[in-house]
Each structure stands twice: as structure tokens, then as C-alpha cells.
From Swiss-Prot:
Its EC number is 2.5.1.18. Liver. GO terms for molecular function: glutathione transferase activity. GO terms for cellular component: cytosol; extracellular exosome. It is found in: Cytoplasm. The lineage of its organism: Eukaryota, Metazoa, Chordata, Craniata, Vertebrata. InterPro entries: Glutathione-S-Trfase_C-like (IPR010987), Glutathione-S-Trfase_C_sf (IPR036282), Glutathione_S-Trfase_N (IPR004045), GST_alpha (IPR003080), GST_C (IPR004046), GST_superfamily (IPR050213), Thioredoxin-like_sf (IPR036249). It comes from Oryctolagus cuniculus. Residues 85-208 form the GST C-terminal domain. Residues 3-83 form the GST N-terminal domain. PROSITE patterns: GST_CTER, GST_NTER. This is Glutathione S-transferase Yc. Keywords: Cytoplasm, Transferase. It comes from the Eukaryota.
Length: 221
């Protein structure tokens, strides 16, 4: 029997947090190996396990996977979170790319110089309210189903709910005008594994902050 997936990153949300969300929603227990020094990263590179010399990296099923989207897709396909046919997968991928576009602004913000963070926050609030949230609310309204695609839980639903949490941490009440998104958030938050993940003391990381920025400098620069 294969062991638990092992996640290689540093002690932050960053690009690994969405992977944590997907594994959690799929009911998969995982281990983490957190880099703390530049030497930890260099050892992974020297060992030849980082194809493009970068993390996140996930050890799973005998593979050492890098590139976030590839990791998303493997987890989703393995755990039946990727639609029933090629058309559903295309929609799931399309929605996921939109989610990732906005989440990218959020996950990079804490690592910007402090004087640039306020402008980035304003951009996040604007794009969430006027571009991304209305688009996903419209999708849910168009078919009246519980999930974005095929009336079945997919990676897009999970990553969207992570995004909703991320935006609301920065802008409380951001989903107030989007009742279907709120309902989706509640639905997925009540999945037993996700409910546990959202509790204090779980493997969910706190929001990235100045401490994470300093750790990243030590490891990556």
C-alpha cells in the first residue's frame, strides 16, 4: 500500500495551500516536509527531485510531481474530482484557471514590499467583486445545481471555496452579494474532512505574513 503523499514546501500557504485543500477534500491524509534553510532547498535540487529546480513538490504514488496545475490534475483525476468526460474537464479547467488567476494576486501579495501591498489589495477587491465572483455566481445560477460542473464535486468547486475564504480574510463580507457562492462555501465547508481542516490546529496554514516573507528570503534568495 502506498504511503501518504509528502508535500515539500516551506512553512507557508503559498502555492502549496491549494494542494492541501484538494487532498483534504478528497479525504487523503498527507505529510509535510518543510524547508527552513537555503540548504534544505539546495539538497532537494542536488538530489535531482525538483525537475525545474523549484517547489512545490509532492511525492505521491512513486512520483515526485512538480508544477502546481499538474499536481492539481493528478489529484483530481485520481479522486474523481475531474468530471465525467472531456467537455466537463474543459469546463473544470477553465474555471480553475480563473480561480488561479485571482488567487495568484492574493498569494503573492504578502511577499511584495509593504508599500505595494495596499494597491494590490485594492486590485484584489475590485477583481473579486466585479469580475470573478459575478462570473461564478452566474455559472451556478445558470444551471441551478449544487456544484459548478455536472452537479458533482470537482477540483474547481474546492479551489473556488478556498478562494472565497482567502478573499474574505482580506475583505470581510466580500461574498455578501453572492448567495450561491455563499451556499457553495457552506456546502463544501461541511464536508467532514474540510470541516476538520478549517479548525485550529489542522494542517491549514494561517495567512502568509511578514514572517513568511522573511523565511522565503532566507530560502529562495
Amino acid at each position: 500500500m502506498a504511503g501518504k503523499p509528502k508535500l515539500h514546501y516551506f512553512n507557508a500557504r503559498g502555492r502549496m495551500e491549494s494542494i492541501r485543500w484538494l487532498l483534504t477534500a478528497a479525504g487523503v491524509e498527507f505529510e509535510e516536509k518543510c524547508m527552513k534553510t537555503r540548504e534544505d532547498l539546495e539538497k532537494l535540487r542536488k538530489d535531482g527531485v525538483l525537475m525545474f529546480q523549484q517547489v512545490p513538490m509532492v511525492e505521491i504514488d512513486g512520483m515526485k510531481l512538480v508544477q502546481t496545475r499538474a499536481i492539481f490534475n493528478y489529484i483530481a483525476d485520481k479522486h474523481n474530482l475531474y468530471g465525467k468526460d472531456i467537455k466537463e474537464r474543459a469546463l473544470i479547467d477553465m474555471y480553475t484557471e480563473g480561480i488561479v488567476d485571482l488567487n495568484e494576486l492574493i498569494l503573492t501579495r504578502p511577499f511584495l514590499p509593504p508599500e505595494e501591498q495596499e494597491a494590490k489589495l485594492a486590485q484584489i477587491k475590485d477583481k473579486a467583486k466585479n469580475r470573478y465572483f459575478p462570473a461564478f455566481e452566474k455559472v451556478l445560477k445558470s444551471h441551478g445545481q449544487d456544484y459548478l460542473v455536472g452537479n458533482k464535486l470537482s477540483k474547481a468547486d474546492i479551489l473556488l471555496v478556498e478562494l472565497l475564504y482567502n478573499v474574505e480574510e482580506l475583505n470581510p463580507g466580500a461574498t455578501a452579494s453572492f448567495p450561491l457562492l455563499q451556499a457553495l462555501k457552506t456546502r463544501i465547508s461541511n464536508l467532514p474532512t474540510v470541516k476538520k481542516f478549517l479548525q485550529p490546529g489542522s494542517q491549514r496554514n494561517p495567512p502568509d505574513d511578514e514572517k513568511c516573507r522573511e523565511e522565503a528570503k532566507i530560502i529562495f534568495h
